[in-house]
Design a protein with these regions (language model features):
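Conserved SAM-binding motif I beta-strand of class I
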Residues: 25-30
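Glycine-rich SAM-binding Motif I of class I
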Residues: 12-16
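C-terminal substrate-binding/active-site "lid" region of AdoMet-derived donor-dependent transferases
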Residues: 77-134
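A short SAM/SAH-binding and catalytic strip from SAM-dependent methyltransferases
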Residues: 65-81
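Conserved class I S-adenosyl-L-methionine
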Residues: 2-10
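Gly/Ala-rich phosphate-binding loop of Rossmann-like dinucleotide-binding domains
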Residues: 19-23
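S-adenosyl-L-methionine
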Residues: 37-66
């Protein structure tokens, strides 16, 4: 089964939905301790607390290496700052999905418009292109 990491997980809705809909294990990383508490409560109420975990911490310092899918809903500047960490920690072939915001020069594999929102999908490459290695 997939292990979804949601970076900047907020109230946990993405992780909880993945667990409820697909039976995926999920880990949310969120810096705001109040949102982490809320996410844990939401997971209990949704009946998926055994599948999900919410960690309070800085997403730039988190170990995300076990992720088989990563989701983001972060500003473009944050996405771009995070990009080298994604390349360093994730295995080639791992999908990265961002809601509304792109990754600058890293062109997505796929872009989908959903009810006025844009969803971007990338795949961690075998080799990092030279223009993206910073």
């Amino acid at each position: 089964t997939d292990v979804l990491y949601d970076l900047g997980s907020g109230d946990g809705r993405i992780v909880i939905r993945a667990a409820r809909t697909h039976g995926a294990r999920g880990v949310g990383i969120e810096i705001d301790p109040d949102l982490v508490k809320k996410a844990r409560k939401n997971a209990e109420e949704a009946g998926v607390a055994d599948l999900v975990e919410f960690r309070q911490g800085d997403l730039f310092e988190a170990d995300i290496s076990e992720a088989t899918v990563v989701t983001l809903y972060l500003l473009p500047s944050v996405n771009q700052k995070l990009r080298p960490i994604l390349f360093e920690q994730l295995s080639p072939g791992t999908p990265v999905v961002s809601h509304d915001f792109d990754m600058g020069r890293w062109a997505p594999d796929r872009t989908v418009d959903l009810e006025g929102d844009t969803v971007y999908r990338w795949t961690i490459p075998e080799e990092i292109p030279e223009d993206l290695d910073e």
